[in-house]
Regions:
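C-terminal accessory module of base-excision DNA glycosylases/AP lyases that mediates lesion recognition
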Residues: 2-46
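AAA+ P-loop NTPase catalytic core and its hallmark functional loops
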Residues: 44-227
Length: 227
């Protein structure tokens, strides 16, 4: 009863996607981001969702496909929200604090990249750019996301690549295809980059993540990162 009371009080502070107070929503306790806080059997109730969740936990990546307008991006985000909420519940001593921090945790742990035909390997992984009149090598958006993730964080991070079919995946992803595999996540995949061309401020961040070894740069995808 105490746990349910805490949940009810925190629900009053939350809103749904359309701005409606979550507490006024129909059956708020069954909301996908709330239920994991009180129902340990959540993953056992929906065989289809269980299958997707099990697959994602095992492979750490998943592609949702189908015609435009079939809620692929929505489903991807809901799956991420559910897994983050479940992890937050399991790793929080205080249920009230966990629910209060839920929205901030979702915002910091779900990374959405809108793909488009002009996306390049340089934009996505690493490549040359001009900085103060000099040509330098800078990490792309994916490498920046990886740099910002705490590898010891028990709450998973999710990268949602929206409209991925609009890019040449082989050309844009490069070494990421291999680095995403579980067997490569600890050792990483070497990138064909001269680290002397990388700005010093970027070098430190990469070193802190263990991505530079023997003057070589490695693409290392954290084990707590899902696609």
């Amino acid at each position: 009863d105490k746990t349910l009371y805490q949940i009810r009080e925190e629900l009053k502070k939350l809103e749904t996607e359309d701005g409606t107070p979550l507490y006024q929503d129909v059956n708020p306790f069954w909301h996908s981001t709330i239920r994991p806080f009180w129902d340990d059997t959540t993953e056992k109730l929906d065989n289809e969702q269980l299958s997707d969740k099990t697959l994602l936990e095992y492979k750490k990546s998943m592609i949702l496909y189908g015609p435009p307008g079939t809620s692929k991006s929505y489903q991807a985000r809901k799956m991420a929200e559910g897994m983050i909420a479940e992890a937050l519940r399991k790793n929080s001593a205080n249920i009230s604090e966990a629910i209060s921090s839920l929205q901030n945790t979702l915002d910091s742990h779900i990374h959405v990249l809108q793909m488009h035909p002009n996306y390049t390997y340089d934009d996505f992984i690493i490549g040359k750019s001009i900085d103060n009149g000099n040509i330098v090598v800078k990490p792309g958006k994916m490498l920046q996301i990886i740099k910002g993730i705490d590898t010891e964080d028990k709450i998973p991070h999710f990268v949602i690549l929206d409209e991925i079919n609009r890019v040449d995946i082989s050309r844009v992803f490069g070494e990421l295809f291999t680095a995403m595999e579980a067997s490569y996540r600890d050792k990483g995949v070497e990138l064909s980059v001269n680290i002397n061309d990388i700005p010093e401020d970027e070098i430190k961040g990469l070193q802190d993540k263990g991505m530079i070894n023997d003057d070589k740069l490695y693409l290392k995808v954290p084990n707590n990162m899902y696609f």
